[in-house]
Amino acid sequence: MELTKIFLAFLCIGVSYSLGSFPSGFIAGKWLKGIDLRKVGSGSTGATNVLRHVGKKAALIVFLIDVSKGIGSILIAKSLFLSPSFHVICGIAALSGHIWPIWLNWKGGKAVATGLGVFLGISWQVGLASLGIFMAVLSSSKIVSLSSISAAISLPILMFLSLQEASFLNAYIIASFAAMIMVLWRHRANLKRLLNGDEPRIGKIN
C-alpha cells in the first residue's frame, strides 16, 4: 500500500472515531437542562437517557445525529476505499467513539443509534430490517433496552441472509457480530434488570 493510501486509511479511521465521539446527548443535557447525563439515569449519553431526562424533541435530534455519525463514517470509508474490511474498521471506530468518547473521559452511549447508522451505510436493507425489529419489540414491550438488544442480536442473522455468498469470515458478518457484542456489553446492567423484572418501560425514569 502506498504511503498516501496508508495516510488516508489512518485519517479515515481517526475521522470515523471523531464522528462517533461527537457528544450530541451530553451537549443536549448540558445546554437544555444543565445536567450531566453521565450522572443521571442510566449514565448513558444516548437518546434514551436524553428522552427520560431532557425531553422528546431533544431525544429525536440526538437520535438523528447519532445515526448520522454512523452513516457518515461508512460513506467516508466507501468513498476512499473499496475494501469491505476497511468499511468495517471505520464502522467499528465510529461505534468505539460513541461508546468511549475521549472528550467525556471514555463514558458515552450504548451504540444503538450509531450502530443503526453504520449498518444503514453498509446495507440499508439490513439497517431498516433491524430498525423494524426494534420498533416491533418496542411496540409490544415498551422497553427500549429489550428492543435494542433484540435488534442487535438480529444483526448477524439479517446480514447473513442478505449476502449471496455469506460466510462467517465475511467482513460484514464479522462487523455484525462485533456490533452485537458491543451493544450487549453496554447493556449489561439492563440485562440484569430485565432478568430481575425491574427494567423501566417508556415513560418511567430509571
Swiss-Prot record:
Give me the reactions it catalyses.
an acyl phosphate + sn-glycerol 3-phosphate = a 1-acyl-sn-glycero-3-phosphate + phosphate
Q: Which GO terms describe its biological process?
A: phospholipid biosynthetic process
Query: Could you say which EC number(s) this protein's record lists?
Result: 2.3.1.275
- Keyword Glycoprotein (UniProt): no
Recall the GO molecular function terms of this protein's record.
acyl-phosphate glycerol-3-phosphate acyltransferase activity
* Keyword line: Cell inner membrane, Cell membrane, Lipid biosynthesis, Lipid metabolism, Membrane, Phospholipid biosynthesis, Phospholipid metabolism, Transferase, Transmembrane, Transmembrane helix
Cellular component GO terms, alphabetical: plasma membrane
The subunit field of the Swiss-Prot or TrEMBL record says: Probably interacts with PlsX.
Give the protein name, as stated in the record: Glycerol-3-phosphate acyltransferase
- Which gene is this protein's source? plsY
